Amino acid sequence: MFPMVTGFMSYGQQTIRAARYIGQSFIITLSHTNRLPITIHYPYEKSITSERFRGRIHFEFDKCIACEVCVRVCPIDLPLVDWRFEKDIKRKQLLNYSIDFGVCIFCGNCVEYCPTNCLSMTEEYELSTYDRHELNYNQIALSRLPISIMGDYTIQTIRNSTQSKIDEEKSWNSRTITDY
Amino acid sequence: MSLPLTRKDLMIVNMGPQHPSMHGVLRLIVTLDGEDVIDCEPILGYLHRGMEKIAENRTIIQYLPYVTRWDYLATMFTEAITVNAPEFLENIQIPQRASYIRVIMLELSRIASHLLWLGPFMADLGAQTPFFYIFRERELIYDLFEAATGMRMMHNYFRIGGVAADLPYGWIDKCLDFCDYFLRGVIEYQQLITQNPIFLERVEGVGFISGEEAVNWGLSGPMLRASGIQWDLRKVDLYESYNQFDWKVQWQKEGDSLARYLVRIGEMRESIKIIQQAVEKIPGGPYENLEVRRFKKAKNSEWNDFEYRFLGKKPSPNFELSKQELYARVEAPKGELGIYLVGDDSLFPWRWKIRPPGFINLQILPQLVKKMKLADIMTILGSIDIIMGEVDR
C-alpha cells in the first residue's frame, strides 16, 4: 500500500515538473510571435546576392588569349577552348569557347586564375531549362550580361538590413550599367 | 507462409537508407526481440563517390572544390585539412592574417555544424521546435560565408598558403554582431532544451561510453570529450593560431548522450569566444602566402621581412608535392579529420587517405544500441553525429 502512495506522489511531482518546463518552453515559443518572418516569397521577392556571389560565368571573347589556364584549374577540365595557331602573327587565335553549365559546379577556380580577367562571375543563378543541352553556353551566350534583379519590376527585392544607403546608391548605379 | 524461425521469434527490421532519421543514407539491419535491440548491423556505401581516388588525378587546386562534399555541414574543415596537408608537406608558412581568417571561418563552420546537429537530434527525440530555430542562426553564418567566399556551402575559399580572398569591407563588424546575437540564441536553446524533463528522460544514461572504451574505439571529438577525456587537437597540435586565444576544452565525464549534448553546446560558446578574440586582434598584412611561387635561390630574406620579395600573385596551379608522406589532422566538429598524404614529385598526390571522424565514430554504434530499446537507436545515432557524405566519401 505504502510504496503505491509514494509512487503516485513522485509521479505527480514529475508531472508538475514536466508541465512547468513545457510552460517555460511555450513562453520561448510565444516570444517568437512578435518577430517578422525570416523567409522570403522567392519568385516574387529576391534577396540581393553578395558581391562575391558565384553565379553563371561571363566570358569576354576579345580578352581571351587561349592560354587554357581555366582548363587546367577546373576540377573536371570543363571549359572548351578551341584555338588555332596563326603563323603570321605568331599568336594563338581563339575560335570558340564554351562552358557547359549543366556540369559546372561554380567553384570559381577559372575566374580566379584567368590571367587576363576575361572570365567573371555574374549574379545570375536561375539556370533551369527543360533541355540540359541548352545549358551548354558558347562564347556568345557566355558574353550576355544577366538581367539585373533590381531592373526587373515584377520582382520585389529584399535588402539585407546591414546594407547601408551607400550600398543602395551603388546598386542603383550598377543597374543602369547592367541593364541596357 | 514460412518465415525463418529464429531463437525467440526475433524480428529483423531494415532501417534506412531512406529513413529520415538515418542522417543521410545509412542502413541499419536491426534484430529485434519485441522492443529490445538484439543486434544491429550498419551498412555503408550508399554515398560512396570515390573521393580518395579522385584526389589521385587532381592537383590540389582542382581538388579543392570537391572536398566540401565530404562533410557538407562542416565545409571549412574539409578545406582546411586539404590545404594543411600539402602545406605541412612542403613547409609553407602562411601569413598571420590568413591564419586568423582561417580560425574565424573554421569556428563559424563549427558552430554551423553543431547547430545542424542540434536540430535533427532534437527532431529525432520528438522536439521539432529547435529544428526551425537553428536554421535562423545557421542562415546568418551562411550569409557571412557567402559575403566572404561567394557561396554558402561550397566555399572553395582556402588555398595553399592562405585564403582565396581577403575579408570584404564591413565583414568583421557583421561577424561581431552575429557573435552577440548568437550568444543570446544559445541561451534560448538551453532554456528550451537543457532542463526539459522529457528531453532528460530520453538522453540521460542512454548510449554510455566509458573513457577507456572511447579511446579503444578510436573515437574523437565530442564523442571522446563527453567521456571525460580532455583531448582537443586545437590544444594538442597547435595548428593555425589557436594557441593565441583564451579558451577551454569542453568536456564532460558522464559519457552518455546528455554529456555529448552538453559538450557540443559548450563548444558553440567557446567557438564564439574564439571568434570574438580573433576578430578583435586580427592583424593586417597579406592574406595569402606569396612565397609559394618564389624561386628557390631567392629564399634568403626572412619571411614577411622588409627585404622580402613577393613574386607571384596566386599560388601556382602547378603546385608540386614532393616525394614525402605525412599525416595531417584538424579538429573538425565531429572529431579528428585527418589526411594521410603521400607525394610523388608530381602535381597529383600519390595517395590521399582520408580519416573521416564520422566513419570512425560510427563503428561503436552496434555496441551502443545492443540491449537498448528501438527508440533509443535514434538518440544514440543522433548523438554520434554522422554525416554520410564523409562516412562513405
Curated annotation (Swiss-Prot), chain A:
Pfam families named among the record's database cross-references: Fer4_10
Keywords: 4Fe-4S, Chloroplast, Iron, Iron-sulfur, Membrane, Metal-binding, NAD, NADP, Plastid, Plastoquinone, Quinone, Repeat, Thylakoid, Translocase
Regions that span the bilayer: none
Reactions accelerated catalytically: a plastoquinone + NADH + (n+1) H(+)(in) = a plastoquinol + NAD(+) + n H(+)(out); a plastoquinone + NADPH + (n+1) H(+)(in) = a plastoquinol + NADP(+) + n H(+)(out)
PANTHER family: NAD(P)H-QUINONE OXIDOREDUCTASE SUBUNIT I, CHLOROPLASTIC
Subunit comment: NDH is composed of at least 16 different subunits, 5 of which are encoded in the nucleus.
Name of the protein in question: NAD(P)H-quinone oxidoreductase subunit I, chloroplastic
Taxonomic source organism: Oryza sativa subsp. indica (Rice)
From Swiss-Prot, chain B:
Keywords for this protein: Chloroplast, Membrane, NAD, NADP, Plastid, Plastoquinone, Quinone, Thylakoid, Translocase, Transport
Reaction(s) the record says it catalyses: a plastoquinone + NADH + (n+1) H(+)(in) = a plastoquinol + NAD(+) + n H(+)(out); a plastoquinone + NADPH + (n+1) H(+)(in) = a plastoquinol + NADP(+) + n H(+)(out)
One Pfam family of this chain: Complex1_49kDa
Enzyme class: translocase
Its EC number(s): 7.1.1.-
Gene Ontology CC terms, in alphabetical order: chloroplast thylakoid membrane; plastid
Molecular function GO labels: NAD binding; oxidoreductase activity, acting on NAD(P)H, quinone or similar compound as acceptor; quinone binding
Highest taxon listed in the record's lineage: Eukaryota
Places the protein is found: Plastid, Chloroplast thylakoid membrane
One GO process term, biological-process aspect: photosynthesis, light reaction
UniProt-listed PROSITE patterns: COMPLEX1_49K
Topology within the bilayer: Peripheral membrane protein
SUPFAM superfamilies noted in UniProt: HydB/Nqo4-like
Disulfide-linked positions: none
Subunit structure, as described in the record: NDH is composed of at least 16 different subunits, 5 of which are encoded in the nucleus.
Function per UniProt: NDH shuttles electrons from NAD(P)H:plastoquinone, via FMN and iron-sulfur (Fe-S) centers, to quinones in the photosynthetic chain and possibly in a chloroplast respiratory chain. The immediate electron acceptor for the enzyme in this species is believed to be plastoquinone. Couples the redox reaction to proton translocation, and thus conserves the redox energy in a proton gradient.
Misc. comment: There is a 56 residue fragment from the N-terminus in a second position on the plastid genome (corresponds to 9311163); it is not clear if this is transcribed.
Family: Belongs to the complex I 49 kDa subunit family.
UniProt protein name: NAD(P)H-quinone oxidoreductase subunit H, chloroplastic
Organism for this UniProt entry: Oryza sativa subsp. indica
Protein encoded by which gene: ndhH
